[in-house]
Amino acid sequence: MDILSLTAVELAKAIREGRTTAVEATQVVLDRIAAAEDVYHCYVTVERDKALQQAAEVQKKIEAGELTGPLAGVPFAIKDNMCTEGTLTTCSSKILENFIPTFSAEAVLNLEKAGAVILGKTNMDEFAMGSTTETSYYGVTRNPRNPEHVPGGSSGGSAAAVAAQECFAALGSDTGGSIRQPASYCGVVGMKPTYGTVSRYGLIAYGSSLDQIGPLTKDVTDCATVLETITSHDPKDSTSMKREDTDFTSALVADVKGMKIGIPRDYFGEGLDPEVRDAVLAAAEVLKAQGAEVEEFDLSLVDYAIPTYYTIAAAEASSNLERFDGVKYGYRAQDAEDLHTMYKRSRSQGFGPEVKRRIMLGSFVLSSGYYDAYYLKALRVKALIKKAFDEAFAKYNVILGPVAPTTAPKLGSSLADPIKMYLGDIYTISINLAGLPGISVPCGTDSQGLPIGMQLIGDCFKEKTLIRAAYTYEQSVK
């Protein structure tokens, strides 16, 4: 049995049936990490001994009948902005290079309760600010589909680890597309749930009103299973929702008959690579052939999403990142003659250029004289974007479009032009602004063999509709 080629759900079944063990699966994937990390650099930290010990404990519980769930014994990777008790959590930043949390994020605890084995922490853009995983203090991650190209970001390490078979599934976070875009670039499935579905407790904040944790997996079945496992109401997160409809695996039905799918014309205009456009429209035809009703429509305000997002996210980041000052934890500059100088040097030396750029931008839009002109205006536009989606979902069950305007760019090509990098998020960020769920599903490759992702967007709390549409497409093209 080729263990590495199994999906997470298939592996858990094989462990339950005694065809392999959690320890064997963990050892196999750790050997794969040792062999492949020099090329791909998906991880910041690999907890080899801890993972094998955890796998042995999980295996005992499986054999005793105490753990019977669909992810018991499955090795997972965790994005390095989620706290993991006793394991380095750096946000891929120098300022947190020695930070070891005393607690774990709620989403990680939910995985561990289900019997998942935690392999380590994946590389990311520093503090989740970036779209290429090139702003990491710990070096770039390479795309397993072509190592000369980026894996996307900011959850690039998680997406690449799944694609490179360096884990069976991973957790990422999505503030403006940071799960869906790397999933598209690496040819895996990635889902951002409705805001408030997965607890943010233990997620080191970037943009608190936009951040959401979600799965990166090999297929849609794994995606639904992981989402079902990590979803819970959490009083420790004031934005956590109480939901009854979290049996997401019940939506794994290949049936879209009568489903109304809208394709926004605005998503297929200038700047979209023709190969991406053709692949996404071909995917829409597959769903149409399965009985879905597909039609084009106008979704206004898309052009305003980027300035709105970078105003709101930067403002929230400048506030959230104030706590990193070298006093209680993290990097502290040496030989500072007074407290103010220590703050200044610690932050100047500890944060990278992209993080500093966004902190300064956020501080500017919140400053006296500019607050009304920029920040309040952005909040008004955010409300209008939500209204535009509400109107669309009065007519359609699902909105279908591309995840990104191009396939994965070459390493180094985006950092030279931050504006170009920001424009790469044009199809994903409005979903975060509106708090909606979205999923990226592989729908082909370009002429270079680089993966293309189709994005399916749903109304609030309609993850099941998205999973049904994504599963139908996946089964139709298998």
Task: Please describe what each predicted stretch is.
Residues 94, 98, 239-244, 307, ...:
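Short, surface-exposed loop/helix-turn segments at secondary-structure junctions
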Residues 1-53, 289-291, 364:
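An N-terminal boundary/leader segment
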Residues 29, 51, 79, 111, ...:
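Conserved hydrophobic/aromatic pocket- or pore-lining residues that grip, position, or stack substrates
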Residues 25-29, 308-309, 355-363:
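Short alpha-helical scaffolding segments that buttress acidic/His motifs in well-ordered protein cores
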Residues 71-91, 250, 255-262, 315-386, ...:
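Short helix-loop capping/hinge segments that flank enzyme active sites or metal/cofactor-binding pockets
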Residues 71-213, 264-266, 315, 401-419:
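Short glycine/serine-rich loop/turn segments
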Residues 31, 35, 113, 164-271, ...:
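Structural helix-boundary/capping segments
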